[in-house]
């Protein structure tokens, strides 16, 4: 069996590709905690199986998704409700950057390492919607077979603070638990072989009641603009481009 930490470092040094890292972790995985089929019932609220496909993007357009939640609530200093609205209306396009690409490349390896270290088996899901609020969606990075939401971030430059979750990601995790009805999530961060942590997050029973009004108001505004494009916000003059932010 290859040295897993060394393999992660080799990837960071450009000497190993993501598929090679993922395969090594998959081979090392040993499921000791999960029962097969434990989350099959959640397939009923999965409206699109594959993430980042044309269908996935189309369905997300009319929803408030978990990754957008913090911005809609004003809890993400790097994004705003106005920017989210304009992207959904097709007025602006976020094409990704080196940080988001790195996060996507390392996600599978981070999940595989999570499986090795916890003994859980992670199932992949696509776009899921709330049974009670079908306009509320989310695409978890995974769900363990024993019912834990798994959300992964692989920052490039951002510091990983032991035991802490960046504020802009807490709303994302809470919305995923609200949608799925699950009571616990694991927030996983990996920044190379030496920096890896898992922070357990419990579902906050007051979260939805606290934020429902603002989320509904944003969705109503989005629906209004989708139905009548003349109501869409006017684009502002473009300012000088700022450096990319590390969304990992």
Per-region residue spans from a language model:
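Intrinsically disordered, low-complexity boundary segments flanking structured domains
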Residues: 71, 109-112, 185-188
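Acidic-basic catalytic patches of nuclease active cores, encompassing PD-(D/E)XK
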Residues: 100-122
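Charged, glycine-rich intrinsically disordered N-terminal tails and low-complexity linkers that flank
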Residues: 1-105, 233-248
């Amino acid at each position: 069996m290859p040295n897993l930490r060394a393999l992660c470092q080799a990837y960071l040094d450009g000497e190993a590709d993501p598929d090679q890292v993922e395969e090594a972790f998959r081979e090392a995985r040993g499921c000791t905690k999960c029962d097969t089929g434990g989350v099959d019932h959640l397939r009923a609220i999965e409206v699109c199986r594959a993430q980042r496909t044309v269908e996935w993007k189309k369905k997300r357009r009319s929803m408030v998704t978990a990754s957008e939640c913090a911005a809609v609530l004003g809890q993400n200093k790097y994004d705003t409700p106005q920017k989210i609205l304009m992207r959904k209306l097709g007025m602006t396009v976020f094409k990704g950057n080196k940080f988001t690409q790195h996060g996507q490349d390392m996600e599978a390896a981070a999940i595989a390492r999570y499986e090795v270290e916890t003994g859980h088996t992670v199932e992949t899901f696509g776009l899921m919607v709330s049974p009670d609020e079908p306009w509320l969606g989310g695409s978890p990075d995974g769900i363990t077979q024993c019912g834990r939401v798994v959300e992964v971030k692989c920052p490039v430059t951002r510091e990983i603070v032991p035991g802490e979750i960046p504020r802009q990601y807490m709303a994302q995790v809470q919305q995923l638990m609200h949608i799925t009805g699950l009571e616990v999530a694991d927030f996983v961060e990996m920044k190379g072989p030496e920096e890896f942590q898992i922070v357990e997050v419990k579902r906050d029973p007051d979260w939805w009641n606290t934020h429902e009004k603002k989320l509904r108001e944003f969705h109503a505004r989005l629906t209004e603009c989708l139905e009548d494009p003349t109501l869409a916000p006017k684009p502002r003059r473009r300012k000088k481009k700022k450096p990319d932010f590390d969304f990992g």
